[in-house]
């Protein structure tokens, strides 16, 4: 749940390991 991935997921996917999409940004925990 923490937006520390530095990645966006406007297409719905995250490439960073351990990160999930909380549109429109990737979050971790």
Swiss-Prot record:
Role of this protein: Probably participates in a plant defense mechanism.
4Fe-4S found in the keyword field: no
Protein name, entry field: Cyclotide mden-A
Keyword list, A-Z: Disulfide bond, Plant defense
Gene Ontology terms: biological process: defense response
Domain characteristics, as noted in the entry: The presence of a 'disulfide through disulfide knot' structurally defines this protein as a knottin.
Disulfide pairings: 5-19, 9-21, 14-26
Covalent cross-link Cyclopeptide (Gly-Asn), where: 1-29
Species of origin: Melicytus dentatus
Organism taxonomic ancestry: Eukaryota, Viridiplantae, Streptophyta, Embryophyta, Tracheophyta
InterPro entries: Cyclotide, Cyclotide_moebius_CS, Cyclotide_sf
Family: Belongs to the cyclotide family. Moebius subfamily.
Post-translational modification: This is a cyclic peptide.
Domain of life: Eukaryota
């Amino acid at each position: 749940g923490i937006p520390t991935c530095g990645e966006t997921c406007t297409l719905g996917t995250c490439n960073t390991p351990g990160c999930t999409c909380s549109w429109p940004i990737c979050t971790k925990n």
